[in-house]
Amino acid sequence: MNGDAICSALPPIPYHKLADLHYLSRGASGTVSSARHADWRVRVAVKHLHIHTPLLDSERNDILREAEILHKARFSYILPILGICNEPEFLGIVTEYMPNGSLNELLHRKTEYPDIAWPLRFRILHEIALGVNYLHNMNPPLLHHDLKTQNILLDNEFHVKIADFGLSKWRMMSLSQSRSYKSAPEGGTIIYMPPENYEPGQKSRASVKHDIYSYAVIMWEVLSRKQPFEEVTNPLQIMYSVSQGHRPDTSEENLPFDIPHRGLMISLIQSGWAQNPDERPSFLKCLIELEPVLRTFEDITFLEAVIQLKKAKIQSSSSTIHLCDKKMDLSLNIPANHPPQEESCGSSLLSRNTGSPGPSRSLSAPQDKGFLSGAPQDCSSLKAHHCPGNHSWDGIVSVPPGAAFCDRRASSCSLAVISPFLVEKGSERPPIGIAQQWIQSKREAIVSQMTEACLNQSLDALLSRDLIMKEDYELISTKPTRTSKVRQLLDTSDIQGEEFAKVVVQKLKDNKQLGLQPYPEVPVLSKAPPSNFPQNKSL
């Protein structure tokens, strides 16, 4: 099958039809954004590959073949692919948008979803098994090999849609992927990977039993609402422990006695993650065991469970207070002779985790020099996030009950009147650092010479150090051309300060962009996140 034939079999979706792109997540097989299709008038999801260098025709065709496989795999519990965006500088799969995110978010956002009823948990497990069983029964069988809670999406009624199957070429070509510390060296995630796959030479023999091992770990995770091996930070420790036969604990501490059909479920889990692949059951056998369990629940209980989650989600959203056009008093840890002044700001300073407003607490001023300058700032750079991998400002600021909700569309706000302690005389801007000065002096040369690979490495480094906000990353990564991405990166550097600029300079040096010499002398950057951000221990 040639490239033209593949393109004709997949509905083409021009890039300019994808309006309002918004960053959602980043994974091994690319970056996922939401968008609004200009003609269809519906929201869609776009998984696009990070293209650092021009793809060879053979590479592009290999990737398109995988997209074609996804397009053919049409089933109730498989994420539907709507088309392909195949352009020189943008290659992406367009799918249905899943409003309730992933199973990982449902299980581990316990503030947002304090309780998940047992009937719904069992329905989710049953639908995952149905979806993977369908893939295994295709001709030829389609093996997922990256099954994890992050790839199990949930539609508006919390039904399962399995994503990211058959994307080995996408994962291979996405060279800029920012690997989790528990990511496997060849795609997939260590905690969901069977021990025989630690040794590549044995993969072909055991490949059919890979997905059932991952499913067993997911069953444990759904029933316990805990992260497998959450206390272990080194993937080598996990690999050694699993290769010695150790698995997540199934005692009452993790799987309490009130779990319906607990004995049967533990039996399924333990057989699914058996050390010997030949001892693991097929998905068909799992379904035969699960179907009688599902029949013990009345249909109404599933509906009640979904309504309960929707109510919890609404309540959590309503507790996120947006400070907008409302005069407020903030305690800013300032001397008594500098009383706090009033702030009017069109941004959200609270994450969902803060819950209902409580007593006023102190606010530590961010280290961003643009913030301290008193200059008007883009509100998007101040928003708090509640999603895996992002650090919010939980507990830093609380809002009086009188605070008003605001329109998220507000584009800018003035922080010049927050406090004379933060903004001396409201006009003096802190001196620009060496790295920032160098970037400003070399701006057009950087735009001309910075490669796509260097750009993506810079974004990865900024993400790993928590130096870039979600909205800023989104603005950069969704630009249609390399030059527009670089310009946006440099604009963001001007706002975010010296530490941000140092990362960009270091990556330019690492990539030997010799036309930009001489480089400024900046300290060698450590790989650890900055100390003023809390460490994220979740997987």
From Swiss-Prot:
SUPFAM superfamilies: DEATH domain, Protein kinase-like (PK-like)
Region of interest: Disordered: 335-368, 519-539
Domain CARD as annotated: residue spans: 431-523
Catalyses which reaction(s): L-seryl-[protein] + ATP = O-phospho-L-seryl-[protein] + ADP + H(+); L-threonyl-[protein] + ATP = O-phospho-L-threonyl-[protein] + ADP + H(+); L-tyrosyl-[protein] + ATP = O-phospho-L-tyrosyl-[protein] + ADP + H(+)
GO cellular component, one term: cytosol
Membrane topology: Peripheral membrane protein
Domain of life: Eukaryota
Post-translational changes noted in the entry: Polyubiquitinated via both 'Lys-63'- and 'Met-1'-linked polyubiquitin following recruitment by NOD1 or NOD2, creating docking sites for downstream effectors, triggering activation of the NF-kappa-B and MAP kinases signaling. 'Lys-63'-linked polyubiquitination by XIAP is essential for NOD2 signaling and promotes recruitment of the LUBAC complex. Also polyubiquitinated with 'Lys-63'-linked chains by PELI3, BIRC2/c-IAP1 and BIRC3/c-IAP2. Ubiquitinated on Lys-209 via 'Lys-63'-linked by ITCH.
Region described as Activation segment (AS): 167-193
Annotated control of activity: In the inactive state, the helix alphaC is packed against the helical, non-phosphorylated activation segment (AS). Upon activation, helix alphaC is displaced and the phosphorylated AS becomes disordered.
Matching PROSITE patterns: CARD, PROTEIN_KINASE_DOM, PROTEIN_KINASE_ST
Residues annotated for ATP binding in this entry: 24-32, 47
InterPro entries named in the record: CARD, CARD_RIP2, DEATH-like_dom_sf, Kinase-like_dom_sf, Prot_kinase_dom, Rcpt-int_Ser/Thr_kinase-2, Ser-Thr/Tyr_kinase_cat_dom, Ser/Thr_kinase_AS
Keyword annotations: Adaptive immunity, Apoptosis, ATP-binding, Cell membrane, Cytoplasm, Endoplasmic reticulum, Immunity, Innate immunity, Isopeptide bond, Kinase, Membrane, Nucleotide-binding, Phosphoprotein, Serine/threonine-protein kinase, Transferase, Ubl conjugation
Biased segments, Polar residues type: 344-365
Domain Protein kinase: 18-294
UniProt cross-references to SMART domains, sorted A to Z: S_TKc (SM00220)
Protein name: Receptor-interacting serine/threonine-protein kinase 2
Species of provenance: Mus musculus (Mouse)
